[in-house]
């Protein structure tokens, strides 16, 4: 499969500078005729010495995550065949939100901290596989997350409320302060429970309301997307049932901290058992939660979306086919 007209977006903060090098290799593998991309570090620097005609987009009036979204929209308007995005799960989610409703598929090259979402076509170390590869377009389900009735972002791996997000510092995956991350700072911080005496989580389906958890039961809240890999794995608990019922998403609330990069074995042993509560989510459902401790942040695929106050209400909904992603066919070498 060949792509004559390619849009390119590079997150220069991903992979400790490896994103731009991976972009060069990706373009060599795909060999497009024309490339639309942001000037300089957002993609233009990857085009030096390549034969493709470059269309450089001036993003200088923008900063932060708004740059990727703006470049993505200009690429779609130019009529590209595919958007090649180099970054992590959060960058890919930002781009998917920016072009929501477009027929242009995403080719995601994972250069971030986790790189576990379904929009990742391949990892940076595997970009050589793109040369002469065959792809299939996959319609990917996703989560819409927001606060007080307004959608703020998309998640294709998970949506969480937490004090920290994952980031890479000196080549190591660590927990960093979510509020600091909103301003581009990676400040190490230990995870903390988000729940207090007034915390609540419910699922709504029309007039039917199901209480999921409350108070100290809510140390961690994760909405995610189960799939058929859980089928037959009974130890997965409620997630297994969602996979059997073809429910596109679910919510897990746990009395332990689950999103962490370090764990003291002895302390964890003393704290067991681990108690969790789970509900499946259909497209007709709306998950709502509030009463969090001060400083908790709503995050989607590692992107901090909103600092929550005690009176704010977070919501999550699921939609099938929320994005179009390219997947390497199994017989591709």
Where are these regions (language model features)?
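Short, acidic/small-residue loops that bind anionic groups at enzyme active sites
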Residues: 95-123
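Short glycine-rich anion-binding loops that position phosphate/pyrophosphate groups of nucleotides
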Residues: 12-13, 88-90, 112-114
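ATP/nucleoside-binding phosphotransfer catalytic cores, i.e., glycine-rich phosphate-binding loops
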Residues: 3-10, 70, 235-333
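ATP/pyrophosphate-binding catalytic subdomain of soluble kinases
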Residues: 137-259
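Structural motif
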Residues: 85-86, 109
């Amino acid at each position: 499969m060949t792509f004559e007209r390619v849009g390119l977006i590079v997150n220069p903060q991903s992979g400790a500078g490896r994103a731009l090098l991976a972009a060069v290799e990706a373009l060599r593998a795909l060999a497009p005729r024309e490339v639309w991309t942001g000037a300089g570090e957002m993609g233009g620097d990857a085009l030096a010495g390549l034969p493709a005609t470059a269309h450089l987009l001036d993003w200088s009036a923008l900063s932060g995550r708004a740059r990727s979204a703006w470049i993505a929209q200009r690429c779609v308007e130019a009529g590209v065949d595919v958007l090649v995005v180099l970054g992590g799960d959060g960058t890919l989610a930002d781009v998917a939100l920016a072009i929501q409703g477009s027929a242009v598929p995403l080719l995601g090259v994972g250069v971030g901290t986790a790189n576990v979402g379904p929009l990742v076509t391949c990892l940076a170390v595997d970009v050589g596989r793109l040369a002469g590869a065959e792809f299939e377009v996959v319609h990917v389900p996703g989560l819409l997350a927001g606060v007080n009735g307004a959608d703020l972002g998309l998640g294709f791996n998970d949506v969480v409320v937490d004090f920290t997000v994952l980031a890479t510092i000196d080549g190591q995956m660590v927990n960093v302060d979510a509020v600091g991350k909103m301003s581009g700072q990676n400040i190490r911080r230990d995870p903390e429970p988000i729940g207090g005496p007034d915390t609540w989580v419910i699922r709504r389906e029309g007039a039917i309301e199901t209480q999921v958890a409350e108070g100290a039961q809510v140390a961690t809240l994760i909405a995610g997307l189960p799939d058929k890999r859980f089928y037959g794995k009974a130890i997965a608990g409620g997630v297994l049932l969602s996979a059997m019922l073809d429910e596109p998403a679910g919510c897990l609330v746990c009395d332990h901290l689950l999103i962490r990069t370090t764990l003291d074995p002895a302390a964890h042993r003393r704290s067991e058992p681990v108690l969790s509560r789970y509900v499946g989510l259909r497209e007709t459902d709306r998950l709502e939660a509030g009463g969090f401790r001060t400083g908790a942040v709503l995050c989607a695929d590692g992107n901090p979306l909103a600092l929550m106050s005690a009176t704010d209400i977070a919501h999550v909904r699921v939609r099938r086919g929320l994005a179009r992603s390219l997947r390497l066919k199994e017989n591709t070498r």
